[in-house]
Design a protein with these regions (language model features):
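Terminal amphipathic alpha-helical/low-complexity segments used for targeting or macromolecular assembly
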Residues: 1-107
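Structural signal for interior beta-strand "rungs" in well-ordered beta-sheet cores
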Residues: 103-105, 109-187
Length: 187
């Protein structure tokens, strides 16, 4: 039942493309303003990012650092928020300049001059200091399953710190100012 809204959102992109094609071929006589609006919201990063982030934030609700039961309310909300974000297309953005706004929309605190090249956590429990650099493929999810427990924690990255590509920052990680985490590391 939780997947019905997610699949509806996913289908909205295809339906928009079909309606646009039908309009261009003269099969339908629809409002151009409505089609352009649907195209911007469902088919471009300018619409997908806010729809995905704000929807995920509403589904997720308030999540605090802690240990929760697997399959419990927090786990299901977190899972559903991740599915919503993926279905919106926000996780497939190739526009790197939209990654920081996506992170902020999810609740992360991002400082000035941050070089952010990876997807932010849906938990919103991320703080990145000014001038920090996060290279591609860094896992900032801030949660993991261990048996029957879901561990959720904040990830904090200090000013001018650098996180190498494909590194994993576990829940509760704090990277201090000017620190350098080598590529492929787990902290």
């Amino acid at each position: 039942l939780l997947m019905v809204p997610v699949m509806t959102l996913r289908a909205a992109t295809a339906v928009t493309w079909v309606l646009l094609a039908a309009q261009l071929l003269g099969v339908l006589a629809l409002s151009w303003s409505g089609l352009v609006l649907a195209f911007v919201v469902f088919c471009t990063p300018l619409g997908r990012v806010p729809v995905g982030a704000l929807g995920a934030r509403v589904i997720r609700g308030r999540i605090e650092a802690g240990v929760y039961p697997r399959g419990g309310a927090v786990h299901v909300r977190l899972w559903a928020a991740e599915r919503w974000l993926a279905a919106s297309g926000a996780t497939n953005i190739s526009a790197a300049w939209l990654v920081k706004p996506l992170a902020r929309m999810l609740g992360a605190r991002i400082g000035r001059g941050v070089d952010f090249q990876t997807l932010p956590p849906v938990t919103g429990l991320l703080t990145v200091g000014s001038g920090a650099a996060i290279e591609p493929g860094v896992d900032l999810s801030g949660h993991w399953l261990d048996g029957d427990e879901l561990h959720v924690g904040a990830v904090t990255i200090g000013d001018d710190a650098r996180i190498g590509a494909r590194s994993t920052l576990m829940p509760g990680t704090e990277i201090r100012q000017d620190a350098h985490v080598e590529a492929g590391s787990t902290v």
